[in-house]
């Protein structure tokens, strides 16, 4: 670990999968480990927030995912990989994970008539069901 790395990072700079992390914090770390394109966002988040705040981080993840879906940011993490990862995590039915995915990802997806709303049709079956519960009108 170098002085400029977050305290929860491994020698290669990736977030450490700590057995003591709460499910919501572990979700963030697992996302960054699975999709390294989120590393810069993660590092900035940890620096600005002085730690990991999963709901705050996932608001940014939602924005990046929609930008990628719309093709507006070639450097944004691939939206398909993000949705696939979140679908897998949602299928685990872990309360701390579900709370973050539903509250800070699904609820912040664009509303009908807004650019990017079509991403809702790309959700896997688990997230689509959760989305329908929290936003029945789309």
Residue spans for each PLM region:
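Polar/charged alpha-helical tracts
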Residues: 13, 26, 30-33, 121, ...
């Amino acid at each position: 670990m170098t002085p400029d790395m977050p305290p929860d990072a491994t020698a290669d700079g990736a977030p450490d999968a700590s057995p003591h992390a709460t499910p919501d914090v572990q979700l963030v770390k697992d996302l960054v480990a699975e999709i390294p394109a989120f590393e810069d966002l993660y590092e900035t988040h940890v620096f600005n927030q002085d730690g990991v705040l999963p709901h705050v981080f996932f608001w940014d993840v939602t924005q990046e995912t929609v930008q990628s879906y719309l093709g507006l940011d070639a450097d944004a993490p691939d939206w398909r990989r993000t949705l696939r990862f979140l679908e897998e995590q949602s299928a685990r039915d872990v309360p701390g994970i579900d709370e973050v995915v539903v509250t800070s990802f699904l609820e912040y997806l664009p509303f009908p008539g807004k650019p990017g709303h079509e991403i809702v049709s790309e959700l896997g079956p688990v997230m689509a069901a959760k989305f329908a519960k929290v936003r029945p009108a789309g």
